[in-house]
């Protein structure tokens, strides 16, 4: 027993209440479920990539602790592996050749990481290599594919696929398809495995490997690392075997920070939506508490009963909300982060942690319990037990003037607090966003009071019974109306702040890539989402293209991804004949013309702001850069943004790249057309020359811009998902809240009928009142959402190192407001009309 009440009695009381107020409890529960679904949905949208990638990396490296890795895609001499194995502290060493590739099958094409392995890698115990490369199915020539890749291209074992790599197209046989029962979630990763010798032939790199995984003898890790560094002689890197994960953490950090901030804002909005859904029941619960007190229950027992009922309702509704959030995350909002597949072994599987489900459940239950405690003031000893029942109208749900004033002051203070926190420390933007969301709720009561005054004045000139009724309801500032407006305000706030910041970031990225690609009319590349970092061999192609009709010039562009410390940086090597080298919109420090001039020479590089900050670099200062030919000295020609790649970029000349990277292989050919030649016609001319190079693709500048724009939007998919989830949740929550509000007011509508109002007057009053409530709520949410957008855009610029110029985006804001308000009016139209038909006898029954 608890406070002299058996648990069975608590269940009995709740069942009795549920029978008496079934519709109200269902509507409140649906609102809670929507809030929980939003919380879980945004948390799942923010699921880190590291969970799936860690399983993939561990499936390859097994028990290896160290790796000797090349600084370029060309790798290093395979004979070095024997010297590694001969080191005193080495227990096992396995060479690997990794190369970006594309597999084409009957159903489509997939970009993969082609991994060439030897049987010695099996001794390291990696799940992937044990189950793919160790079996007899790969003895000979062929590749092994995870089921995710095989299903995507539509092949099975012994089928033939087309493999594109190094600018060449080859037909290879699929020797094995391995599923999750053998390699777990790695089965969804974009990989292809073959024997090392065969991979070397496929990639045109005979006798080359890109890394050696090393398992030291017990206790010999540091000694072996030292020996490997001596063996590397400044031309190779020595790193932990799971260095891929460390690099991925660095690249994912800005995006994770941004999506985490917005996910938490979205989750908080979901929490408050849940809270507001419960607030809709406050008037009836206050009457229920008064009835309990009149029946002889003391304050502790009344509190226990209401708390228990809230706990049951919150738990059941949260379970439904979790199911809704799970379905949303696996249908409309399942992330496919293939934009990183060319740089990391990232799969499209979504890792769902039990902790996220428990967190969403806890949020739903906690919000329900907190909202159920709102009537607790009625339990104080100085207040009469039946005070609520004796209030005018019997509702006891109005917010008085003093409380309204306190809320208004609190709202203004929260806005000022958010501003001060963000100015003092940008890392406090998350707390500032939460403060603005709370301010949104606090300012609604005073907005209602102001609206009532304005509309009361308007009513003197506009004689409308509907307006009279609407103004009377607004003046009471009832809890259900405040909660209803709060639903719309919170959703609009979150959607405007998150969607606006995402739009700014995308606009900055689009401008960057447009300038980056402006140096050529037609680009010849290997295709794919690779930031133009895949080199290829195409002997004689440049000369053939230069002789083609309508072609003005052909230039070699080079570039790759290179590991520099904890960063996998984007190396951009521009020919001196390019029109512009530094994207103008991305320049932060230095002079554009001067920087371009320096980069056309030798020994200069433009560095991104993240790299410059990490190494305390300023324009003109020297720095050392590890290259495949050893450490080389460069000077800073300019400092740019991160130019669309989170770890940062280095821009230098192709002359320096050829010299220090020791390769002349292009990553792209930049083709400029004669004046007056249509880009589409020029592309057809280029494609006719590419007939002998089936693995290469020609794209006009506009087509390549569209590809990069699509990649940017995929990279920021989580922010779009969260913004969309907020609007969907708002629509569902508004529908639930409006239905609950109408249901609760049946007695009031019946009493108005007794006073002479007909159904059509009541219906118009409901529509007008709903329009005003949602309009003011959404307006407050939009205003503070725009301010949150300003703060978020500034924070994104500082966090990601990308350009994110602020844009108000009024049409986008109006669209969000119109969507939520429009849904509300559509939802209330039919139920409102049905409610307006209520019999006047209901007033006497209540």
What are these regions (language model features)?
Residues 1-8, 12-31, 254-257, 318, ...:
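Alpha-helical transmembrane segments, especially those used as permease/efflux helices
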Residues 52-53, 230-268, 281-283, 292, ...:
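Peri-transmembrane interface segments
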Residues 25-113, 136-137, 151, 159, ...:
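Hydrophobic, regular-secondary-structure patches
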Residues 275-278, 312-343, 355-381, 410-422, ...:
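Small-residue-rich transmembrane alpha-helices
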Residues 112-152, 511, 531, 539-619, ...:
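Short beta-strand boundary microenvironments
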Residues 22-47, 253-290, 311-324, 363-370, ...:
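Hydrophobic alpha-helical transmembrane segments of multi-pass inner-membrane transport and secretion
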Residues 25, 29, 36-63, 279, ...:
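Alpha-helical transmembrane segments
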């Amino acid at each position: 027993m608890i406070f002299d009440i058996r648990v069975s009695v608590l269940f009995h009381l709740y069942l009795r209440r549920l029978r008496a107020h079934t519709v109200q409890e269902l509507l409140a529960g649906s609102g809670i479920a929507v809030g929980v679904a939003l919380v879980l949905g945004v948390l799942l949208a923010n699921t880190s990539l590291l969970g799936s990638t860690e399983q993939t990396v561990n499936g390859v490296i097994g028990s290896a602790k160290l790796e000797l890795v090349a600084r370029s895609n060309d790798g290093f001499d395979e004979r070095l592996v024997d010297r590694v194995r001969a080191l005193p502290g080495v227990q096992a060493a396995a060479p690997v050749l990794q190369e970006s590739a594309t597999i084409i099958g009957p159903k489509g094409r997939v970009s993969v990481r082609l991994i060439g392995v030897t049987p010695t890698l099996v001794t390291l115990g990696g799940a992937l290599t044990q189950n793919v490369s160790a079996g007899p199915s790969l003895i000979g020539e062929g590749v092994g594919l995870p089921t995710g890749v095989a299903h995507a291209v539509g092949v099975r074992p012994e089928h033939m696929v087309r493999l594109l790599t190094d600018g060449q197209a080859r037909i290879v046989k699929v020797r094995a398809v391995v599923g999750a029962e053998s390699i777990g979630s790695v089965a969804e990763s974009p990989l292809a495995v073959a024997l090392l010798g065969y991979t070397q032939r496929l990639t045109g790199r005979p006798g080359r490997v890109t890394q050696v995984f090393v398992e030291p003898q017990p206790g010999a890790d540091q000694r072996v690392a030292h020996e490997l560094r001596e063996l590397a002689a400044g031309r190779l890197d020595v790193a932990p075997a799971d260095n891929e994960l460390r690099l991925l953490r660095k690249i994912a950090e800005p995006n994770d920070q941004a999506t985490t901030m917005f996910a938490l804002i979205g989750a908080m909005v979901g929490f408050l939506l849940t809270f507001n859904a419960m607030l809709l029941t406050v008037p009836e619960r206050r009457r229920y508490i008064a009835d309990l007190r009149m029946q002889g229950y003391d304050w502790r027992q009344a509190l226990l009963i209401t708390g228990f009922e809230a706990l049951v309702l919150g738990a059941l509704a949260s379970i439904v909300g979790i199911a809704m959030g799970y379905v949303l995350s696996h249908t409309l909002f399942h992330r496919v982060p293939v934009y990183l597949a060319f740089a990391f072994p990232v799969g499209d599987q979504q890792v769902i942690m039990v902790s996220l489900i428990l967190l969403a459940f806890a949020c739903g239950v906690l919000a329900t319990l907190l909202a159920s405690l709102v009537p607790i003031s009625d339990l104080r000893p100085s207040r009469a037990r039946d005070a609520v029942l004796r209030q005018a109208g019997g509702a006891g749900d109005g917010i008085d003037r003093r409380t309204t004033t306190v809320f208004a002051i609190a709202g203004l203070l929260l806005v000022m607090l958010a501003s001060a926190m963000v100015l003092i420390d940008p890392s406090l933007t998350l707390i500032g966003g939460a403060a603005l969301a709370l301010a949104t709720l606090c300012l609604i009561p005073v907005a209602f009071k102001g609206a009532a005054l304005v509309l009361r004045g308007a009513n003197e000139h506009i004689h409308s019974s509907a307006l009279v009724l609407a103004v009377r309801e607004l003046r009471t500032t009832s809890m259900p109306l405040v909660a209803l407006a709060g639903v719309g305000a919170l959703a609009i706030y979150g959607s405007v702040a998150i969607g606006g910041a995402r739009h700014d970031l995308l606009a900055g990225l689009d401008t960057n890539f447009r300038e980056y690609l402006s140096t050529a009319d037609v680009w010849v590349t290997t295709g794919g989402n690779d930031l133009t970092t895949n080199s290829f061999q195409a002997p004689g192609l440049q000369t053939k293209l230069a002789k083609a009709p309508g072609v003005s010039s052909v230039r070699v562009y080079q570039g790759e991804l290179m590991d520099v410390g904890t960063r996998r940086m984007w190396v951009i090597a521009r020919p001196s004949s390019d029109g512009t080298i530094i994207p103008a919109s991305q320049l932060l420090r230095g002079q554009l013309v001067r920087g371009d001039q320096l980069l056309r020479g030798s020994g200069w590089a433009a560095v991104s702001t993240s790299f410059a900050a990490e190494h305390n670099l300023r324009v003109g200062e020297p720095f050392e850069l590890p290259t495949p030919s050893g450490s080389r000295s460069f000077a800073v020609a300019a400092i740019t943004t991160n130019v669309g790649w989170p770890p940062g970029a280095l821009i230098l000349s192709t002359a320096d790249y050829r010299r220090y990277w020791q390769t002349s292989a292009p990553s792209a050919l930049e083709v400029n057309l004669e004046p007056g030649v249509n880009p589409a016609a020029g592309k057809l001319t280029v494609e006719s020359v590419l007939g002998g190079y089936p693995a290469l693709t020609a794209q006009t500048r506009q087509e390549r811009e569209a590809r990069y724009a699509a990649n940017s939007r995929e990279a920021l998919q989580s922010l779009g998902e969260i913004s969309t989830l907020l609007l969907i949740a708002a629509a569902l929550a508004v529908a639930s809240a409006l239905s609950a509000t109408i249901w609760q007011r049946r007695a009031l509508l019946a009493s108005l009928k007794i006073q002479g109002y007909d159904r059509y007057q009541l219906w118009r009053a409901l529509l007008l009142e709903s329009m005003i409530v949602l309009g003011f709520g959404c307006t407050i949410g939009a205003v503070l959402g725009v301010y949150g957008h300003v703060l978020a855009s500034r924070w994104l610029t500082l966090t990601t190192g990308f350009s994110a110029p602020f844009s108000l985006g009024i049409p986008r804001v109006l669209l969000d407001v119109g969507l939520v308000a429009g849904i509300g009016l559509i939802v209330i139209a039919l139920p409102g009309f049905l409610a307006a038909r209520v019999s006047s006898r209901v007033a006497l029954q209540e």
